[in-house]
């Protein structure tokens, strides 16, 4: 079961935070919310679609931080929860390190980590 204000999908809990933070501050914020929580990681298109359903109406076309970056390991993107990045729909090459998702169309954007964005946290229930 997920705590109040969190949504459940496939054994994980998700929550959209309409607060503006840099990527690293958002990741730290997520880890403080629940044991094992991180910025959201996507392991399937269906999971990404579920998160999109939580956020798209509130964002009106903006992007949200997700837990994918190459902040710690240049040239190799990794999820903050330790899951391997093997999401077939995306191939990432960019000059920036942090990834945001645009929920209205599930497109991913690689942008500077210092931008202020809303975000989604996730943890295993």
UniProtKB/Swiss-Prot annotation:
GO terms for molecular function: toxin activity. Residues 9-122 form the C-type lectin domain. Is a standard reagent for testing vWF/platelet interactions and detection of the defects in von Willebrand disease and in GPIb-related disorders such as Bernard-Soulier syndrome. Pfam families: Lectin_C (PF00059). InterPro entries: C-type_lectin-like, C-type_lectin-like/link_sf, C-type_lectin/snaclec_domain, CTDL_fold. The keyword Disulfide bond applies. The keyword Disulfide bond applies. One of its GO terms (cellular component) is extracellular region. Expressed by the venom gland. Keywords: Disulfide bond, Hemostasis impairing toxin, Platelet aggregation activating toxin, Secreted, Toxin. It is found in: Secreted. It comes from the Eukaryota. Disulfide bonds join 2-13, 30-121, 98-113. Belongs to the snaclec family. There are two distinct forms of the vWF-dependent platelet coagglutinin. The dimeric form (snaclec) is 34-fold more active than the metalloprotease botrocetin in promoting vWF binding to platelets. Snaclec that binds to von Willebrand factor (VWF) and induces its interaction with GPIbalpha (GP1BA) (via the vWF A1 domain), resulting in platelet aggregation. Heterodimer of subunits alpha and beta; disulfide-linked. Botrocetin and vWF form a soluble complex. This is Snaclec botrocetin subunit beta.
């Amino acid at each position: 079961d997920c705590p109040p204000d969190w949504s459940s999908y496939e054994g994980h809990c998700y929550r959209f935070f309409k607060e503006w933070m840099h990527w690293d501050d958002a990741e730290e914020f997520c880890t403080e919310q629940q044991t094992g929580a991180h910025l959201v990681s996507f392991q399937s298109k269906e999971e990404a679609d579920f998160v999109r359903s939580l956020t798209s109406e509130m964002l009106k076309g903006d992007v949200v931080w997700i837990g994918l970056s190459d902040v710690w390991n240049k040239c190799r993107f990794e999820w903050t929860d330790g899951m391997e990045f093997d999401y077939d729909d995306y191939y990432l090459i960019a000059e920036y390190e942090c990834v945001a998702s645009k929920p209205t169309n599930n497109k991913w954007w690689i942008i500077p980590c210092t931008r202020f964005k809303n975000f989604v946290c996730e943890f295993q229930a």
